[in-house]
Amino acid sequence: MDASQLTRNLAGIVGEKYIITDPAKTEQYRQGYRFGEGRALAVVRPGTILEMWKILQACVEADVIVITQAANTGLTGGSTPDGNDYDRDIVIVNTMRMNIIQTINNNEQVVCLPGSTLNQLELLLKPLGREPHSVIGSSCIGASVLGGVCNNSGGALVQRGPAYTEMALFAQINEEGKLELVNHLGIDLGDTPEEILTNLQGHHYQRKDITQDAGKGHDHAYCDHVRQVDEPTAARFNADPARHYEASGCAGKLMVFAVRLDTFPQEKQTAVFYIGTNDINELTDIRRAALGEFESLPVSGEYIHRDAFD
């Protein structure tokens, strides 16, 4: 299939309004927040997860590279091409039109579609007396929920650790080289990809369809793991295999259509402390005491350079 045929097929899926091929108009999608830029055959903006699936089918058939992109706010790249030395054409699938969030299990969990943002989730949960795992992305409040899960974001979070779930709906190329949809959300949505995606998009399921013990909705062990201050390795580092599970930490190797996550009771009384010193060893002592000795862990913590502090 040639490039022009693929773009026609993609336009047939989403409509001419939601496919962009003009390089001047695709630049905002092809250029990263901090770094990374390259050519793309097209940017496609599906309005439903069924359209997203059909786009992926067409791209796999055409043997092009697919980059799934949400808010494009990441500081470490991965949401855009990086250079122009790829061996195939690239299609960017921007997910921000699909921003549905569904609360389940008495608001103790949520199901988030690819375009939902952390800020949107926080505002949804606040009147319910709940809060999400993370309340801000690495760079701004526009960061997506799924982007955080796919990249295990949340390095400053001490109590809850990196974004993580074992419950997701995703597509992968299997060992036979075939595209398949995998429903590990723990929600009975039907049998075919079309049924699963349509029923999820429309919230066409009931409480009886939800499996309660389908997997973890956050990293339950991190609060103990982070207290091990005498271990030879850091508790938190990029691409930690201990926090890779299907969609979690997949970093673009899967196309993720939805994740199921835990929510948390709102913190009633919190305070922010700024601690300044000219001796980095004092900060090390404070960190070791807070992690190793405090009865309650800090919600989050971050080192800030004196220039930023001032």
Name the predicted role of every residue range.
Residues 1-61, 73-111, 137-138, 261, ...:
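N-terminal flexible segment immediately upstream of the FAD-binding catalytic core
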Residues 6, 55, 121-124, 283-287:
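Hydrophobic side chains in well-ordered alpha-helices
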Residues 17-19, 41-43, 64-67, 89-92, ...:
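Structural motif
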Residues 17-23, 69, 133-136, 284-310:
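Flexible, glycine/charged-enriched surface loops at secondary-structure junctions
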Residues 48, 73, 109, 116-121, ...:
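Short, structural beta-strand-to-alpha-helix junction motif
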Residues 60-61, 187, 262-264, 288-293:
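Short, solvent-exposed amphipathic alpha-helical segments in soluble enzyme
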Residues 126-281:
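FAD-binding subdomain of flavoenzyme oxidoreductases
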